[in-house]
Amino acid sequence: MAKMKTKSAAAKRFSVTGAGKVKFKKMNLRHILTKKAPKRKRKLRHAGFLSKVELKVVKRKLLPYA
């Protein structure tokens, strides 16, 4: 059986931490920021982590060698 390929789109969007969690950057912080509240923009600066259900799918299907 051939080796599985890592999905390059997923590799660009997700990174795996040392503890095995999958980290990603939150959306909605690129442009049209004037109508967004400062509190919302502040919360969007922090990284997001996948839930356990999503974690299994992403690690198995998209990032097999992570």
Curated annotation (Swiss-Prot):
GO BP: translation
Cellular component, GO annotation: cytosolic large ribosomal subunit
Residues that span the membrane, as ranges: none
GO MF term (any one): structural constituent of ribosome
Protein keywords: Ribonucleoprotein, Ribosomal protein
Pfam families: Ribosomal_L35p
Superkingdom field: Bacteria
Keyword Ribonucleoprotein belongs to the record: yes
Family membership: Belongs to the bacterial ribosomal protein bL35 family.
Listed NCBIfam families: rpmI_bact
Protein name: Large ribosomal subunit protein bL35
